[in-house]
Amino acid sequence: MLFRTYIHRYVHTKALRFLRFNPIKGRSLMAHIRRTRHIMMPSYRSCFSYSLFASQNKPSNRAL
């Protein structure tokens, strides 16, 4: 989760810099980030807690 947050912030920062130098392409890039934010950070658009979801999907200690 933290890695995804880091990637999203990194891309967002790059998009803001791009927006400063090229407003038209920068706006479309920011719109793309807004549309795909739920992939990188599921808690943004979901009603359940991502941490709860992650805790349910932890590998068990039992051998297969």
From Swiss-Prot:
Superkingdom classification of source: Bacteria
A Pfam entry, by short name: SpeFL
Any Gene Ontology biological process: transcriptional attenuation by ribosome
GO molecular-function terms, A-Z: rRNA binding
Disulfide linkage: none
Keywords: Leader peptide, RNA-binding, rRNA-binding, Transcription, Transcription regulation, Translation regulation
Membrane spanning residue stretches: none
Residues involved in L-ornithine binding: 35
Induction: Induced by ornithine, repressed by putrescine. Part of the speFL-speF-potE operon.
UniProt motif Ornithine recognition loop: location: 32-38
Family in the record: Belongs to the speF operon leader peptide family.
Quaternary structure annotation from Swiss-Prot or TrEMBL: Binds ornithine in stalled 70S ribosomes, blocking the upper two-thirds of the exit tunnel. Contacts 23S rRNA and ribosomal proteins L4 and L22.
Job description of the protein: A small protein (arrest peptide) encoded upstream of inducible ornithine carboxylase gene (speF) that controls expression of downstream genes (usually speF and potE) by transcriptional and translational attenuation.
Record protein name field: Leader peptide SpeFL
Gene source species: Haemophilus influenzae (strain ATCC 51907 / DSM 11121 / KW20 / Rd)
